[in-house]
Amino acid sequence: MDPEGFTSGLFRWNPTRALVQAPPPVPPPLQQQPVTPQTAAFGMRLGGLEGLFGPYGIRFYTAAKIAELGFTASTLVGMKDEELEEMMNSLSHIFRWELLVGERYGIKAAVRAERRRLQEEEEEESSRRRHLLLSAAGDSGTHHALDALSQEGLSEEPVQQQDQTDAAGNNGGGGSGYWDAGQGKMKKQQQQRRRKKPMLTSVETDEDVNEGEDDDGMDNGNGGSGLGTERQREHPFIVTEPGEVARGKKNGLDYLFHLYEQCREFLLQVQTIAKDRGEKCPTKVTNQVFRYAKKSGASYINKPKMRHYVHCYALHCLDEEASNALRRAFKERGENVGSWRQACYKPLVNIACRHGWDIDAVFNAHPRLSIWYVPTKLRQLCHLERNNAVAAAAALVGGISCTGSSTSGRGGCGGDDLRF
């Protein structure tokens, strides 16, 4: 059999025919089919899941079953990863529908991508609003004032209202005086914050002298956690005996110790809420507890004040008799609460001495003190007293050895020249 004949018979090539043939007609553009009411209603039944899961390879039947369980795209975006796992497990158990491994990862990836998209939209919207405010302000000086006021948020609203009325009275309703006054007020508040920072962070020395007159002054400023809201000023504390009720616009020490018991109750409530939500449970009184107390209406409980007197409460818990005796003695002498607060350190240092200078162990061993952090000054005083005790013991041992050497006639430390 001739192979050449087979190939020539199979492939017939006619170049002239290829030139004569006309090109195929261009197909008409595809018209997009209108969305029927049935299709729109079906998409609404999915709750936006078709747009959320579309690019991630999740089967349509899986999305439909998730929608049957009552979940929407907004619901899934607000859920945590553990809750998404529970949702997928419920889907498998209820409908006996086995999810693919890629679908499980795809659902989580889609939710994370949607969260990022929403966050970017919020940031763009906020930047756009700020740009509009800046462009509408005018000159450069107004730019700085407006930007600072917008960043401060609600904390500058009373300042704006007050300065607006002042500017309206002084300038006949002009706008330039309003912004200048707002900027000047802001600079004054920033200077006050700078002056308050070293007072709050340094070891309490001079502030305790005037504590009887103005005890809660630093608690009502903006240095605490209450930026943006004005805390109601509380009456100052005075030294009172156990069971004595303070008269006038004063608060006694029994009321102060009662605040610590309230903080303990708020901590228990925060722990219960955190366990129900599956979140990290705090074991000590932290900023989260103070924020919860403020939201619950107990704005008189604030972090600076509670940390300021925590060692006084510790003495009350560890040795109530010594605490009561100290209160009676200072009440008889007419001392203010600042002097009483300073005097509470020494009994605690003595208690730490009996426990090997480990003040942290003393706090953690007590059920009512284990939720509080040890004050830095108390820890420093214990460390200082321990060093002094070690140095005194070493000097005593050295003196005894030197005295023994001089009496035996071997010289050594100089004998009679030492003075103890």
Curated annotation (Swiss-Prot):
Biased composition (Basic residues): 185-198
Site location (Interaction with DNA): K280, N287, R291, G338
Known DNA-binding region: 233-237, 302-309, 373-376
Transcription listed as a keyword: yes
Subunit structure: Forms homodimer when associated to DNA. Interacts with SYD and BRM.
PANTHER family: PROTEIN LEAFY
UniProt-recorded name of the protein: Protein LEAFY
Organism field: Arabidopsis thaliana
Classification lineage: Eukaryota, Viridiplantae, Streptophyta, Embryophyta, Tracheophyta
